């Protein structure tokens, strides 16, 4: 990847809107900065097509695919390393998300990562922190999306607390205002439902404290525009959202009796169906977290994705930082992890891979899998690889998408033991697993012993390992282990040939 590419792009497949931004990277005295040069927004309302049994209907999928085809045209000339597309809550919970994503990736022309709630929160904070003036105090960032709401407390560019709750403007509007009707009782019930969710985190968050509250993304900005344009804020407050401003907006909405009859300055048509749900959640935020005023920012998830992408281009990949933290936390034997990782990569480099970018990515995943393959020893030596895989699959891992975590976890799970357990797993990359298992087998002594020249290759749908016969004769345990390894691969109908050479 070229350092500081002139243009980067991020795509946010939100539960309410799909958004694309293109940013230009510029070097300043304070470091690399990203300036937005283009943006597209499509009010897809994907969450509105989610049924009670968590299935996306065809109409919402079609809206999403159409939007992504238009985005794809704008991104047609971009290098894959300069684009990152992420999907959030609706595609986290939809049972047929895979069906949607297959067509979505074809429409966009780039991979789409489904990210976990806390990873979404981390990226939201990164975007917000880069778009507001520097401050020495702590900030609370609240991002009300279509299907979830993220709460982050951070200082400077570092998040301290991150949570994602399953309340959003689309899902809340569908649950409490399906026909757009609003009255005192229904609004109160919607507020209480949101409050019950926020109460889970409110005590801990208030104990941590903050000096500034910021609302990011569409709901906060839409509410701010409405209270500002219609003079709902108290005198002297020219921008942002005040408690009094929200209450006056609520009164106007209840008086109108239906969101479609509400006549206010700055009320955009695509915001009407989700206004009541978003307002009730923001009211609950103010009440449960004792907030009196919220400033707003345009910087949110998509800007955070751009800065994360920029970090990767400058070799500051958050995933590497996360793996390093896990190694410290779980007391990983660094020498052994390094040994296995280096050997696995050496084997992988002998295999055919025509795509240089794919090769570079796979080398990173092999290194991460080697670094994490023994973290399960912190639980038990027995079946440690299963414990390691469970942690890698389920822990919050900043920088990793769900797909990333699944890839690493599959390698970690498969590096030892029977291969049959992976037969039904879609996330297994068998050539990488071949390299990792062989490296782990040869590094069993956990010491820097000299290994002979070992050649590996793929042939006839399987693998071949070639090593000197003289060396094998002096290492009977390795000889036995290789025969067992070959038998294990044969069980899943993958040829595995060990050739002892005379050189």
Predicted regions and their residues:
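N-terminal basic/disordered segments at the start of proteins
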Residues: 2-34
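Helical "lid/coupling" subdomains associated with nucleotide-phosphate turnover
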Residues: 2-8, 45, 49-78, 90-96, ...
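Short beta-strand scaffold segments in enzyme catalytic cores
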Residues: 18-23, 149-153, 223-224
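N-terminal glycine-rich anion-binding loops that anchor highly charged ligand groups
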Residues: 32-48
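Cationic, histidine-enriched alpha-helical/coil surfaces that engage anionic ligands
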Residues: 82
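C-terminal amphipathic alpha-helical interaction region
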Residues: 497-503
């Amino acid at each position: 990847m070229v350092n500081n590419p002139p243009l980067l792009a991020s795509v946010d497949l939100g539960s309410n809107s799909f958004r694309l931004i293109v940013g230009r990277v510029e070097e300043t005295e304070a470091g690399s900065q990203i300036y937005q040069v283009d943006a597209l927004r499509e009010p897809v309302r994907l969450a509105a097509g989610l049924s009670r049994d968590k299935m996306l209907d065809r109409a919402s999928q079609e809206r999403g695919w159409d939007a992504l085809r238009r985005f794809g045209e704008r991104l047609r000339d971009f290098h894959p390393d300069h684009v990152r597309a992420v999907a959030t809550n609706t595609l986290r919970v939809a049972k047929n998300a895979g069906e949607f994503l297959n067509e979505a990736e074809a429409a966009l022309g780039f991979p789409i990562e489904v990210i976990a709630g806390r990873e979404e929160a981390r990226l939201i904070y990164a975007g917000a922190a880069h778009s507001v003036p520097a401050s020495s105090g702590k900030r609370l960032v609240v991002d009300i999306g279509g299907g979830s709401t993220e709460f982050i407390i951070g200082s400077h560019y570092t998040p301290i607390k991150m949570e994602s709750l399953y309340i959003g403007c689309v899902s809340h509007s569908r649950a409490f205002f399906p026909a757009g009707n609003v009255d005192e009782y229904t609004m109160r019930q919607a507020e209480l439902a949101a409050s019950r969710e926020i109460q889970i985190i409110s005590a801990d968050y208030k104990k941590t404290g903050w000096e500034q509250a910021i609302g990011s993304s569409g709901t906060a900005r839409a509410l701010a525009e409405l209270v500002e344009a219609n003079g709902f804020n108290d005198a002297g407050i020219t921008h942002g959202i005040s408690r009094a401003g929200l209450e006056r907006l609520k009164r106007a909405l209840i008086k109108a009796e239906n969101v479609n009859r509400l006549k206010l300055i700055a009320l955009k048509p695509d915001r009407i169906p989700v206004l009541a749900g978003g307002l009730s959640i923001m009211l609950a935020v103010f009440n449960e977290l004792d907030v009196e005023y919220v400033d707003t920012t345009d910087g949110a998830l998509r800007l955070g994705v751009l800065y994360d992408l920029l970090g990767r281009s400058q070799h500051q990949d958050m995933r590497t930082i996360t793996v390093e933290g896990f190694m410290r936390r779980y007391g990983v034997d660094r020498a052994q992890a390094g040994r296995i990782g280096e050997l696995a990569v050496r084997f992988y480099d002998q295999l055919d891979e025509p795509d240089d970018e794919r090769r570079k990515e796979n080398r990173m995943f092999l290194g991460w899998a080697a670094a994490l393959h023994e973290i399960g020893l912190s639980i038990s030596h027995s079946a440690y690889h299963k414990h390691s895989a469970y942690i890698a699959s389920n822990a919050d891992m900043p920088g990793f998408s769900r797909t990333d975590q699944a890839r690493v976890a599959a390698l970690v799970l498969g590096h030892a033991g029977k291969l049959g357990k992976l037969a039904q797993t879609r996330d297994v990359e068998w050539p990488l697993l071949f390299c990792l298992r062989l490296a782990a087998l040869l590094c069993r002594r956990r010491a820097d012993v000299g290994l002979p020249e070992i050649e590996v290759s793929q042939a006839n749908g399987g693998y071949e390992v070639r090593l000197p016969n003289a060396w094998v004769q002096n290492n009977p345990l390795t000889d036995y282990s290789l025969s067992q390894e070959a038998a294990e691969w044969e069980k899943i109908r993958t040829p595995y040939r060990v050739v002892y050479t005379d050189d």
